[in-house]
């Protein structure tokens, strides 16, 4: 019978040699893994910083937009008010006039009306004067129906003008409408 057992000392030396070889082989891999980890951590830090900058910029844009909207609301009427100042000046001059000349007062009132109409038009306020138009319940308010030679549901007279601002009705025109025959 042959002895197939190896010497325990030689077996231990072989294991130590293979472990040393494995450790030597693992060292470059560990260094590469450490380098990859460090690179990934640096990338994460960079992305976090970019995220925080983008978030701060977004907040600044949102805040500026809110401030712009607040200013727009606050000063929206400024231009309109500037156009009304000449009307105010004319009315104050008329009140201060003590001449008693009716023709002069009438001329001043007509001028003031033209100034007011101009100021309203600059503010995009437009009169609705729909005589002869088809009745539109969105723009007109019928006060009565009257017999007329016009087509039924046509505006016959305007009792009070209506007004729109940028195609939105501020006040509907008060009208009488032709009765169906």
Swiss-Prot record:
Family affiliation: Belongs to the GrpE family.
Residues covered by region (Disordered): 1-39
Swiss-Prot/TrEMBL GO biological process terms: protein folding
Keyword tRNA-binding in record: no
Chain's gene name: grpE
Cell compartments where the protein resides: Cytoplasm
GO cellular component, one term: cytosol
Protein name per the record: Protein GrpE
Subunit architecture: Homodimer.
Polar residues composition-biased segments: 1-20
Protein's UniProt keywords contain Cytoplasm: yes
């Amino acid at each position: 019978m042959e002895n197939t057992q190896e010497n325990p000392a030689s077996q231990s030396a072989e294991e130590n040699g293979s472990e040393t070889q494995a450790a030597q082989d693992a060292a470059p891999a560990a260094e590469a893994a450490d380098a990859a980890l460090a690179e990934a951590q640096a990338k994460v830090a960079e992305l976090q910083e970019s995220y925080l900058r983008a978030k701060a910029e977004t907040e600044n844009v949102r805040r500026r937009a809110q401030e712009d909207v607040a200013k727009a609301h606050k000063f929206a009427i400024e231009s309109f008010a500037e156009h009304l100042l000449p009307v105010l000046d004319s009315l104050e001059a008329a009140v201060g006039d003590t001449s008693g000349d009716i023709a002069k007062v009438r001329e001043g009132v007509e001028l003031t009306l033209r100034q007011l109409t101009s100021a309203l038009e600059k503010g995009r306020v437009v009169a609705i004067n729909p005589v002869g138009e088809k009745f539109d319940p969105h723009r007109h308010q019928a006060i009565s129906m009257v017999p007329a030679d016009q087509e039924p549901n046509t505006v016959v007279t305007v009792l009070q003008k209506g007004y729109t601002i940028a195609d939105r009705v501020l006040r509907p025109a008060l009208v009488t409408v032709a009765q169906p025959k």
